[in-house]
């Protein structure tokens, strides 16, 4: 179980955050994060939260509370910049590492790595990455735990995922929470062994009560399964694991 994005980092990166709006009060952190933590505790789950490095400066108490509750805080870029477009990735990864308290995991915003990303991650002390893909393995020696686009809440709810939805034979228009529930529950029912990643976004709980209900239902089922934090799953990956199967598409394609 993983959660992506916290706070206003992505909106600052895109230039959509109002200049007169104070920082450090984002609803995803102040309203939804405590509720998500409560749901995880209800089902005895420990999750991984991929947070942008900026959150280490804006929400240090919230990140520390996640760790205190047994969850992992990993890196999701500095301000949610599409990673395949980043030229100064070493500087951004180092800055995020320091701001987040030296995380060991990284998930590239928009899902794609650059050719040199694995080597930089290893150099900076990261032990795994989580790009888009369908099979876990080792990429240049780095544990790689991919996610599938259709197992992300944003794939269903956000307009800019239209290209990905159409590629997969789904409607271009955003889809309701019921479609997410059906697809994720089918994947969980079919899953018997190996690695499977689910991604939810705290800010997307604002889609409505049904979005919260879907998350609650998924967590209840995950609580009956062998559900690891990502750092634990990476540590369990054999040293001689083969190459991962990655997906080179992204939501900004």
What are these regions (language model features)?
Residues 201:
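Conserved strand-to-loop "acid loop" that flanks and positions the catalytic carboxylate
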Residues 1-105, 110-152, 178-198, 206-253:
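Catalytic alpha-helical scaffold of carbohydrate-active enzymes acting on polysaccharides/glycoconjugates
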Residues 153-189:
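Aromatic-anchored helix/helix-loop segment that forms the rim or "lid"
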């Amino acid at each position: 179980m993983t959660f992506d994005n916290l706070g206003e980092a992505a909106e600052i990166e895109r230039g959509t955050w109002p200049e007169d709006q104070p920082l450090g009060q984002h609803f995803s952190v102040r309203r939804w994060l405590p509720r998500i933590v409560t749901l995880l505790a209800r089902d005895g789950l420990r999750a991984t939260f991929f947070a942008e490095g900026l959150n280490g400066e804006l929400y240090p108490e919230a990140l520390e509370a996640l760790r205190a509750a047994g969850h992992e805080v990993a890196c999701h870029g500095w301000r949610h910049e599409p990673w395949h477009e980043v030229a100064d990735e070493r500087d951004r990864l180092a800055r995020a590492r320091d701001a987040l308290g030296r995380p060991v995991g990284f998930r590239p915003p928009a899902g794609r790595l650059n050719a040199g990303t694995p080597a930089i991650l290893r150099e900076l002390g990261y032990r795994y990455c989580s790009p888009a893909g369908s099979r876990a393995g080792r990429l240049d020696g780095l544990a790689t735990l991919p996610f599938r686009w259709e197992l992300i809440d944003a794939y269903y709810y956000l307009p800019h995922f239209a290209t990905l939805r159409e590629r997969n034979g789904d409607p271009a228009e955003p889809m309701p929470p019921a479609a997410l529930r059906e697809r994720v529950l089918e994947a969980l029912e079919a899953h018997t062994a190996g690695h499977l990643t689910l991604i939810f976004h705290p800010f997307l709980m604002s889609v409505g009560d049904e979005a919260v209900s879907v998350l609650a239902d998924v967590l209840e089922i995950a609580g009956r399964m062998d559900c690891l934090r990502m750092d634990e799953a990476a540590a369990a990956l054999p040293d001689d694991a083969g190459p991962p199967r990655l997906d080179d598409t992204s939501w900004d394609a």
